[in-house]
């Protein structure tokens, strides 16, 4: 019984630690910009600023929305329209 309660406390502690280290989507990560006398790394542009592309966000698929007005019946009249030519 004592081992079980220790395991539960350990799992809950790990959950709290992992939640506190997560970065929310609304928060923007800032990268440190090197000084002028530092050499330009392979991941930095000559101007000192690095090219940082935004991370892809996950979003729900909208299956019920049709992408085209004329369905080519490749989706067996479901109406998804993903394979229709525009």
From Swiss-Prot:
Keywords: Antibiotic, Antimicrobial, Cleavage on pair of basic residues, Disulfide bond, Hormone, Secreted, Signal. Disulfide bonds join 68-84, 71-74, 72-80, 75-83. GO terms for molecular function: hormone activity. The keyword Plastid does not apply. GO terms for cellular component: extracellular region. This is Hepcidin-1. It is found in: Secreted. The gene is hamp1. Residues 1-22 form the signal peptide.
